[in-house]
Amino acid sequence: MQYFAGVVCPADVVIPTDDEEAYRLYPAERWVYNKLAICETQGLEHGPHGIEPRRFPVFSKPIYNLRGMGAGTTVIASRDEYERVQTPGHLWMPLLDGEHVSSDVAVVDGTPVWWRHTTGVALGDGMFDYWTVAAEPRPAVEAYCGEWLSRHLRGYTGLVNLETIDATIIECHLRFADQWVDLYGEGWLESVVELYADGRWRFHEAARRPGYSVVLFGCHGVRYRIDGERVNELRRVPGVSSIQITFHEDRPLEMHAMPPGGFRLAIVNCWDLAVGLLVRERLAPAFRALQAPDAGLVTQVIGGE
């Protein structure tokens, strides 16, 4: 929530930053969270588990997942494997290949009026080492997804986050990606408030520059104590835009939505990738691993690749 401090917003305007809130706010558009519908509107071969694919491999995931983080996703390589791993509430779809892009889009009555694209370096098991917030457009993504938005979200005004592989939509969210909004430029959040309050988009970018969002992971099943003073010191390093702590010390571990491969501790947003990677390395010791609840062992912090 640190990004939103000091941004004036009318009391009657609600801007969703998570899928649970967006689902409640937009009953007419919340069908986009149904992955069967995302496939069907694009003519992709797909089906719920129980309907056998005609060819393998396929990609499998929950039909609905409002908590994200790649929960429940897997590749099914063969018919034999499919018979073993069928799961109620899951679907299969094509295993796509190509560039995986996360795109934030400002939309007015279904028409895209602003785009920003981000690509991630995957570590596996739903984890990403870092993300690059690109300055340049993605013409193929904007052409294909712009036409899809105009056909299927007419009447909707607000932010949309689209995840694509090779310009094919795999996820649609009725919100923006709040991980790196400070890298979009001064005045962006104020423009978001105006979009939701008045239905206008008037954000003007003098010049775009790329940014980077570097992720620090720990291990599942371990509680961590944060050295807040050290975190604040690193926030002041030149080239760092922000450091976000991505969990709550006072909440049970299982209450946090996390990827299968690790427990996300913090995010370093920066303008220089080398600076971000160095700050992550220095940040890791600020998270002291307490004893694991079952094994009684102190688990080492994962700092990326």
PLM regions with names:
Residues S60, W92, H117-V121, T164, ...:
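Short beta-strand element of the conserved SAM-dependent methyltransferase core
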Residues H46, T87, H152-Y156, R235-I243:
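Short secondary-structure junctions
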Residues M1-E21:
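Protein-protein interaction modules outside structured cores
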Residues F56, E99-V101, G158-V160, P210, ...:
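Residues at beta-strand starts and edge strands
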Residues R154-A167, I245, V268:
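A short glycine-rich, hydrophobically flanked beta-strand micro-motif that places a catalytic Asp/Glu
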Residues Q42, E194-E305:
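Peripheral (often C-terminal) accessory segments that flank ATP-dependent C-N-forming ligase machineries
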Residues E99-H100, V105-R154, D166-V215:
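ATP-dependent carboxylate/phosphate-activation module, predominantly the ATP-grasp catalytic core
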Residues D18-W148:
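Active-site nucleotide/adenylate-binding loops and adjacent lid/helix of ATP-dependent enzymes
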